[in-house]
Amino acid sequence: NKVKNTGYELAIKGALLRFLSILIGQHGTSLPADTTDTRRLKTVLQLIEAEYATPLRIEDAAEACGCSQSHFMRWFKKMTGQGFTAYLNDHRLNLAAELLRITDATVLDIAGRVGFDNLSYFNRLFKRRYGMTPREYRSK
């Protein structure tokens, strides 16, 4: 069980690094200088990494940044190119895909681990993102 937990933690860290490299790739070869925006973005990304498995709300992220929900939603989309919920779900789906590859946990268990409490919703988003169900993804 200890080995499985270590593997799980490494999978999460690896998926996060891949996700951050994609984000950096979308914004050029490097992140902008340390500005208020980059500090806020770092705060939100750390919040997502720490809380992705919980029912993380836009209100929580806006509060972490010290701004209103409406301002946060506009700002986050400007910074990342996508809305907060879409970004959070992409992060969760990346982690789920990694867990499907490296563990034999059930799809239901993986969905719950990455923050989806509705299996049908998870399956629908996963299929939209990867073009196949989680079970099909695992068997490929």
Residues covered by each model-derived region:
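Generic recognition of well-ordered alpha-helical segments
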Residues: 18, 43-46, 74, 98, ...
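Residue-level recognition of oxygen-bearing side chains
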Residues: 105-106, 121
